[in-house]
Amino acid sequence: MPARSEPYRPDASIVAELAAGAVLLHDPSGDCLLLHQRDEDRWCFAKGHVDPGESLAVAAVREIREETGFEDVRLGPELTEVSYRFYRPKTSENVYKTTVFFLAFTRERSTHAEMIFDRAQWFDLASARVRVKYPTDRRVIDAALRHRSSLGPTEDRA
């Protein structure tokens, strides 16, 4: 995980990063899993860097498994793409990061979150939208709400 970020600096060099993640829904309840990142005191989705040669879909599933401990992960449709920039003091460079988010499903409930998270909790999507810190994360949840309503009842996805 990158060190705590600072505002973008116009005088620093820039690198591009690609990440993949997901809004993970519990099947059949439809609750959304959020992970609480202790060092930044914020709720977030499972997501992370795409490894060389890895597809976005494979990266999203891998990140969910690594960050939650879940094995039963079924990837749904791509939801949206979010891009933002920030300054990383550790490397003295700006980062332009793009994260592609998917909708994903699991029947598992009990997580074994990575050490960078102090807790994981299930929320209905409306409550999750209130808990996330950034407007971009709210847009991701909005996309999940739109896609979920187009899928119909949970039983239809089996």
Where in this protein do the model-derived segments appear?
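Acidic, metal-coordinating catalytic segment for phosphate/diphosphate chemistry
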Residues: M1-A22
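Short aromatic/basic micro-patch
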Residues: C44, Y96, W122
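Short, charged, intrinsically disordered terminal tails
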Residues: S149-A158
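Conserved Nudix-box catalytic region and its N-terminal flanking loop in Nudix hydrolases
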Residues: G30-E71
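A short catalytic or substrate-binding loop motif that flags glycine-/basic-rich loops and adjacent residues
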Residues: I14-L18, H26, N94-Y96
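Active-site segment of metal-dependent pyrophosphate-handling enzymes
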Residues: G69-R109
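NUDIX/MutT-family hydrolases
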Residues: F101-L103, T111-A144
